[in-house]
């Protein structure tokens, strides 16, 4: 939160000494949550709190008048008990004119609002207002508070923590600011119909600090959806869309829609101790970043998204649906593991859930930036690890990217932006393609002072746009890149440049297929003491320069090297089409092995 108040400014020295001697927890206003719901509100006097107990409402305790403990609102629970009571921060609670921030601490609570039973039956669908009632922590729009949830279990039949809620039914698009600390806390989702562990609604700014190990788990909700789908199938019916999301940033609730307005979520590690972590497990979508919203992982944050499954959700089967900027910075880590799509299945031998196929790691239409010694790792995806739609871009700087996908590694549409690796380590492994750009695309792919590999088991390591592509593939500034696939480069680029003492090693049947860029031709330029080393195996041409509409060219200059070798029996080392050229200008051409 901004504009933090100096909380001891109004205290006398004598009072400060007294507080120090007693300790803040001994004199704080403390509520036992099992005794009733807790509400934080504000009136003309300032921010206050109270509890609705069985024998009535307690007196308001004002933050500024609680001089012995700096106004902290502490909510605990008797050990061994469970409650369905909740916490609500009303709209516009800021204590803006007071001396202290509104500081709410839930410590050791065990809340379960998952019971949806009635006297007759369990409803197939929980009404929206009922789900809101079952949300455990609600912060109204326009509020500005600190919120800590420590050593707690939140099992919810609605959302876990919902920020920026329109509680008065007169949505004014007010900005909401929350500093949220998660400290060894578990959020368990049990409702299958449009719920999330953490929601930052439109116009919310939320900073999450992670301490210890924290979890958002939707397994119970997904199993319920799986059973629903099985039952519907038996009846010859389709099951309704179900969205169980780990985190939703922007919009007004979880669901198929990813529209939103100006929400921002920052997830931070704990600077004072070991790295804090957040594990998001068993959801239809691990995180949704809505339009005009953004998410940043910083300060050594560690976020792990596992086991996302689509079911009948239109946005499901994705680790992240990204319609706004995603940044991983300052030694932070984002891991996405095991992403599937398709019908839910029940299998008791597989702990209830079996995952399908065709899931994306990140479904992106905006900027992904990984910087500052950070790591982005995506593995176990059944479709593309990163699917880039129109407007997307990927920048990895001074960091690490690891991709191991059963589909494509990076798959960009024609309208997608650039892919840049600078001072980074990159390891991309896909099945059909390592990096792919759709026909007519203008994506520039750059390796700048970077090392790594791009591989594809059954296709092409780097698949440029088809003919008429507008992009460029550049490997420069002492980069070392290994391509391992049946075809190394499918060059629909205008130019492929290897420069600045860089080396590209290509292992496979075909090193490069020249299919022509926007000009109808592709230029391969190996320059600046660089090397293009093609280690071929199989009966094929190492360089196919005869596929473009207009004549393509190869230029090797400035003491650079083109090295072609064949381990088995191959076709021609280089096949030139009509008008194609091969020029060695202070360059070296080496061929060895069993070429024709």
Language model regions located:
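Sec-dependent signal peptide cleavage junction
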Residues: 20-32
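Bacterial Sec-dependent N-terminal signal peptides
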Residues: 1-14, 18
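Acidic Gly/Asp/Thr-rich repetitive segments characteristic of extracellular carbohydrate-active
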Residues: 39-96
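Extracellular lectin-like interaction modules
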Residues: 142-143
């Amino acid at each position: 939160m901004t504009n933090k108040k100096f909380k001891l400014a109004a205290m006398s020295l004598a009072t400060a000494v007294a507080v120090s001697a007693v300790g803040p927890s001994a004199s704080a206003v403390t509520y036992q949550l099992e005794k009733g719901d807790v509400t934080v509100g504000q009136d003309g006097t300032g921010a206050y709190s109270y509890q609705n107990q069985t024998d009535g409402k307690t007196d308001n305790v004002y933050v500024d008048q609680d001089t012995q403990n700096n106004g902290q609102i502490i909510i605990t629970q008797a050990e061994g008990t469970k409650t369905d009571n909740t916490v609500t921060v009303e709209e516009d609670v800021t204590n803006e004119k007071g001396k202290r921030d509104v500081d709410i601490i839930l410590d050791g609570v065990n809340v379960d609002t998952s019971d949806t039973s009635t006297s007759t039956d369990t409803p197939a669908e929980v009404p929206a207002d009922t789900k809101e009632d079952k949300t455990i922590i609600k912060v109204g729009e326009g509020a500005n508070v600190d919120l800590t949830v420590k050593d707690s279990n939140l099992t919810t039949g609605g959302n876990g923590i919902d920020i920026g809620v329109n509680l008065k039914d007169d949505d004014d698009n007010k900005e909401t600011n929350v500093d949220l600390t998660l400290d060894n806390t578990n959020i368990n989702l049990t409702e299958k119909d449009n719920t999330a562990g953490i929601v930052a609604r439109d116009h919310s700014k939320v900073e999450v600090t992670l301490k210890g190990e924290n979890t958002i788990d939707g397994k119970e909700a997904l199993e319920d959806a799986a059973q629903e789908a099985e039952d519907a199938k038996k009846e010859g019916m389709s099951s309704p869309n179900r969205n169980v999301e780990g985190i939703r940033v922007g919009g007004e609730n979880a669901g198929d829609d990813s529209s939103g307005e100006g929400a921002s979520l920052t997830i931070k590690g704990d600077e004072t101790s070991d790295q804090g972590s957040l594990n998001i497990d068993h959801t239809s979508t691990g995180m949704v970043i809505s339009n005009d919203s953004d998410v940043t992982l910083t300060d050594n944050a560690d976020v792990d998204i596992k086991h996302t499954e689509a079911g009948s959700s239109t946005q499901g089967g994705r680790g992240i649906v990204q319609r706004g900027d995603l940044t991983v910075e300052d030694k932070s880590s984002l891991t996405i593991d095991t992403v599937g799509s398709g019908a839910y299945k029940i299998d008791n031998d597989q702990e209830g859930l079996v995952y399908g196929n065709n899931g994306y790691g990140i479904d992106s239409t905006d900027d992904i930036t990984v910087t500052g010694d950070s790591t982005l790792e995506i593995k176990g995806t059944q479709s593309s690890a990163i699917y880039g739609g129109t407007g997307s871009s990927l920048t990895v700087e001074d960091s690490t990217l690891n991709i191991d996908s059963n589909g494509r590694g990076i798959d960009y549409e024609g309208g997608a932006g650039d892919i840049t690796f600078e001072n980074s380590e990159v390891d991309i492994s896909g099945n059909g393609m390592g990096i792919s750009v759709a026909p007519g695309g203008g994506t520039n792919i750059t390796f700048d002072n970077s090392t790594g590999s791009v591989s594809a088991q059954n296709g092409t390591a780097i698949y440029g746009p088809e003919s008429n592509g507008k992009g460029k593939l550049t490997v420069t500034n002492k980069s070392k890149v290994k391509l391992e696939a049946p075809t190394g480069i499918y060059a629909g680029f205008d130019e492929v440049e290897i420069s600045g003492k860089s080396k590209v090693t290509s292992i496979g049947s075909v090193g490069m297929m020249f299919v022509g860029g926007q000009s109808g031709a592709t230029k391969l330029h190996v320059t600046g003491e660089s090397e293009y080393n093609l280690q071929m195996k199989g009966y094929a041409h190492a360089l196919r320069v005869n596929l473009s509409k207009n004549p393509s060219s190869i230029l090797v200059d400035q003491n650079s090297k083109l090295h072609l070798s064949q381990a088995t029996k191959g076709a021609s080392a280089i096949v030139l089409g009509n008008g194609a050229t091969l020029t060695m200008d202070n360059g070296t051409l080496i061929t060895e092995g069993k070429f024709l």
